[in-house]
């Protein structure tokens, strides 16, 4: 069996999981989210532990068991604590401003770039060169962060651009004459 699927998901206090007709519903203090369970995977709940196992003994079923376990664990963390991603704007004159569900970026183009955040993702700008994105949905948060980063990805020569706070940009040396 998959190494990931062997580890059970522990439910923290205040989080409940219900299963009805292959649909897993997770409820917590930050809302509720649902996940469609794959047909090759079955789930058992014992007190505050959720255990995943494949329904048939095949490599594909084991892979799906690990994937479903990771997805459910992300839902549990999302409805309990939520997720956060930080983006840094590095470059002269690069600025960001969050208003409502829009992020306005000045990143070296002749016009400001406006990005509308997807439903469930919120943004704040503690400084003009930092964007903090928060959401319960890890996948949606990562996609929104990647879309914002895509407007001006970090370049390898000067390191200018939009980068994740934990991202290390490999620098290149300029061409010698």
Curated annotation (Swiss-Prot):
Belongs to the universal ribosomal protein uL6 family. The keyword RNA-binding applies. This is Large ribosomal subunit protein uL6. Part of the 50S ribosomal subunit. InterPro entries: Ribosomal_uL6-like, Ribosomal_uL6-like_a/b-dom_sf, Ribosomal_uL6_a/b-dom, Ribosomal_uL6_bac-type, Ribosomal_uL6_CS. It comes from Psychrobacter arcticus (strain DSM 17307 / VKM B-2377 / 273-4). This protein binds to the 23S rRNA, and is important in its secondary structure. It is located near the subunit interface in the base of the L7/L12 stalk, and near the tRNA binding site of the peptidyltransferase center. The gene is rplF. GO terms for cellular component: cytosolic large ribosomal subunit. One of its GO terms (molecular function) is structural constituent of ribosome. One of its GO terms (biological process) is cytoplasmic translation. Keywords: Ribonucleoprotein, Ribosomal protein, RNA-binding, rRNA-binding. SUPFAM superfamilies: Ribosomal protein L6 (SSF56053). Pfam families: Ribosomal_L6.
